[in-house]
Amino acid sequence: LYTEIYMKKENRAMLEMLMCAALWSIAGIFIKLIPWNSFVISALRSLFAGLTVLAYIRIKGYRIILNRQTIVPGLLLGLVYIAFVAANKLTTAANAIVLQFTDPIFIVIFSALFFGQRFKKRDFIAVICTFIGIGMFFLDQLSEGYLLGNFVAIFAGACLGGMFIAMGKAETQERFSAMLVGQAVAFIFGLPFIITTKPEISALPVLYIIILGVLQLGIPYILYGRAAEHCPPLACSLLGAVEPLLNPVWVLIFDGEKPGLFALIGGVIVIVSVTVWCIAGSKDSEGADAREAS
């Protein structure tokens, strides 16, 4: 009976993770469709996402915790929100999401640089392959805007990796509190741009920003927070890869934006490298757990 209940929870968690990744993937197309400054978009998107997460926190009866383990990752998450939207405005949606998807590689690099963790052979191979993939993105569009967009997307990936390290083994209430801090950071940062750029207020952009805040950012983070409790790490990694695969597809279908050939090749290298590395790490963890149990 316990096994059946656990499997049901695990299956539900995997479904929630898949829904989460699918909803995350609609970011690129809606960011492209809103004719506003990127900082305005990230601010208002975070406002609606924050209200969504706050409502969930209240329903669940969670406390909002402000300490080092929520403020530091929250600040980094806020930078991710800001940089990701800016990257989507500066470069292609495919470049923006795939280059941000490099965050696990930055976790390895930061852990080695700042915490003295030693590289395993597979870590070294994954880092090299990922950076080869990243390099491919810079062979396609050499205009100043695209180059800047690529660097901003890589910065978002680095901040996301740093966020996961700073978050550590935070409890559920701390994870949701960090999300709120991140959304507050992005909103406060964008306030001056809302005032100075005076974005055109019309029905479609307002509808799109609400969709971005509630459906693309707020609800997926709630789903992710729920799924993380029961979804196996390997399944999370594989299902999470749905986002960078679907994101450019929606933009191609609804906006006609096509990534370049080298970007496509680089994207495949990055996604495969990160996913295979995550699978190998998950199998090692499962093997270690089995040895401890025996």
What does each model-found stretch correspond to?
Residues 40, 47, 85-116, 156, ...:
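Specific alpha-helical transmembrane segments that line the substrate/conduction pathway
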Residues 1-40, 75, 83, 142-169, ...:
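Glycine-/small-residue-enriched transmembrane alpha-helix faces in small-molecule transporters
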